[in-house]
Amino acid sequence: MRVSYDELKNEFKRVLLDRQLTEELAEECATAFADTTQAGAYSHGVNRFPRFIQQLEQGDIVPNAIPTKVLSLGSIEQWDAHQAIGNLTAKKMMDRAIELASQHGVGVIALRNANHWMRGGSYGWQAAEKGYIGICWTNALAVMPPWGAKECRIGTNPLIIAVPTTPITMVDMSCSMYSYGMLEVHRLAGRQTFVDAGFDDEGNLTRDPSIVEKNRRLLPMGFWKGSGLSIVLDMIATLLSNGESTVAVTEDKNDEYCVSQVFIAIEVDRLIDGKSKDEKLNRIMDYVKTAERSDPTQSVRLPGHEFTTILSDNQANGIPVDERVWAKLKTL
């Protein structure tokens, strides 16, 4: 089924107002979830909203909390989120990173005691839309086994890198082959994953999303490489923010909250003139896109370019929402 942007946003806002959020905060939060869903990140928009409400009701999310700056070192700042709403706080932090980059050429914000930021790509895109390179990542609950283990000891720790091309080029990836949100998308669609997603109970690679959702044996992206990347991203976020690590969140909290996040903006325009920038970036993109196709019916993919098409389609034709997800939203 498809619903209009306003219909979806109004449902989000209704639920938030019922949980005693202020009118202003409910409007801002509902807009963020609707924007994420309309942009095509269904797994971290409408699909994730019931989980957000669960954490709100548990007290993991403190809606009226105000993030505060703890430390300033020129182009680097350390902030404390105080468990405020994750996606709204993340937007503010990337805005601040952009402000610092406009002054220093680069801006780095390290955030502690944060909540799940929903679609991490939103914040890389936010920087790229303003002409900056945007880089951000978060640590997370231990929901993935490190390479060589069965037991979950590392987070999926999503990493986003966005470049101000036309259209925007952006990598938005967890350190696993699939996030749990994308496993849900495949399961709801009644299909297997396109590549191996994890291990079954016997240790064999599997593309069955329901098996991996149940046994939580995600496959790290690039095998040992994704495992290693997850670990170092966790270390850096923990050090820069003086916040909680994956092990601390996993062992000391009763759910995924008080995570650590990093937001980086890099100003490009003072490093290279606009004409040269466009020529160099277009040459890279053209070189990639004109490679001989392995499948003549499938175009060569540049990361993030599909979101421009998805957004246009959803704006014109309504936003796809799984009927089961919509029914659940209506009951909240």
UniProtKB/Swiss-Prot annotation:
Any one GO molecular-function label of the UniProt entry: 3-dehydro-L-gulonate 2-dehydrogenase activity
Residues forming the catalytic site: H44 (proton donor)
Binding site for NAD(+): I168, T169, M170, V171, D172, M173, S174, W224, K225, G304, H305, E306
Protein name: 2,3-diketo-L-gulonate reductase
Main location: cytoplasm
EC number(s) recorded for this UniProt protein: 1.1.1.130
EC category: oxidoreductase
GO cellular component: cytoplasm
UniProt xrefs under InterPro entries: Diketo_gul_Rdtase, Mal/L-sulf/L-lact_DH-like_ah, Mal/L-sulf/L-lact_DH-like_NADP, Mal/L-sulfo/L-lacto_DH-like_sf, Malate/L-lactate_DH-like
Family statement: Belongs to the LDH2/MDH2 oxidoreductase family. DlgD subfamily.
Keywords from the named record: Cytoplasm, NAD, Oxidoreductase
Subunit structure: Homodimer.
